[in-house]
């Protein structure tokens, strides 16, 4: 279990590990032939690493980051069901280094019964990203993450399991480790190695402004959004509030976009990119 702050390089850990394992370094011992670089996907070698990630936006970021590092990554999610068969063929042929799936896929009958057994049998590595979602003590508990336990239990002996998070306090970390350890060993006492670093970041600030009325909050945004440096995210409680807030801010001249469950998938991806590149002042999201 790796608990390190955002930007520490957790994704680099599993990307590098994937390459080393798929090229044969996991079995290498001094005095034996050195694995050949670029030999990923060789016959009889390890299959793709499986990364469980909770959000499509995170998956897109990880696929892009993997591509920049020369790693072949694909996703199987609710938005590309028609491509699942093609992706399965690519994985079976050793053409994929990393397969990203959402925890909800673990409860999909087709994925669970037809896809998952083959992945588990040959996986180089299993990664649970945003692992705080496993714990009901965590701020972002996802019930579907509880289904990861049976996946881990079904893995062949020796398949490494890595969990990563940037937002787990000590209690959440202990809960994650206990659950992973039980899934791995089938006993309450876990055998999980925990790497934990400082999570605070000096550039983050937290401020609280009490504005009980919706009109007051919108008025504050209209008056002060332009004074805030850079781009950011404005969170609202409902889809309608996000759309209404974005509409009012745009009418006032602010370059903002609504980002909700009703937003088209292509529009979401474009909005994410616009935010990262500071082409919009803010996304108004739920």
Residue ranges and their predicted role:
Residues 1-22, 36, 41-49, 53, ...:
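Helicase motor core with emphasis on the C-terminal RecA-like subdomain
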